[in-house]
Amino acid sequence: MKAILTHPGSAHKDDFLACCLLIARYGLPVWRRDPEPGDLDDPGIIVVDVGGEHEPERGNFDHHQFPAEHEPVCSLSLVLQHLGLYEDARTFCEWLEPTEWFDSRGPFATADWLGIERSVVNRLNSPVDITLLRRFAQKRELEAGDPVWEVMRMVGEDLFMYLRTLRERLDYVAAHARVLEVGEGDETLKVLYMPRTDPMPDDPSSGLSRYIEQTGAEIDGLIYPDRRGPGFGLSRHADNERLDFTRIAGEEDVHFAHARGFVAKTTATDLGRLAELMVRAKV
């Protein structure tokens, strides 16, 4: 394979991120110019966001030829589909659908779809967005060693890693976590408990909230291994105000309770004691 080709001029998040993924996957240079005769027919050139053709088998990923009533889609969507990542990305990357809307419908229609004032859209930009897109737009060619190309490779690698490891993490949570009911009567709390396993994942609490979203379980709080010690972390789920962990700050085996009451750390490992602490934290 030779290169990734995308249009010159201004750059947007969709073509930038599509190129990031392709750089991470194939390690190719990027050419920023209009396609020349034969580029679309050359399987060694991946044509992104330009060319008027969506032919993945030939490496062509443009969406501008789709009719106006076509569902919101962008070049990033097409590349994610080709890489087999689209469904997970739509599920786990909340920013993807607004990106599709923004690129295919524009900022005003996107604001209306989101139910926000149109002025809010510009408030969501940051120097990270502005600088990376501007520096990318200024380039005619990018290759390994160029600072912009290297940052794009890192962005693509991190997105690949996030989607791959999150799916693995959800499978891990499903295999080990269980829902507990602690307390009695109206005082009952539903808690998702993640036991300590061997080996332990790097971040034991990672994926718990996503798992709850996927299963639709009604959960008040979480109990999970503390990655900094042998005990456990206790926290609210979705900032559930039925739990205030400042209420257990004075317990002998509680060594940390956040002043805002949403999380605590304990040296306790016995499940009965952990359940008792959750009940005592109930408002």
Model-derived segments and their meaning:
Residues V121-P201, A217:
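Acidic catalytic cores of enzymes that act on phosphate-bearing nucleotides/polynucleotides
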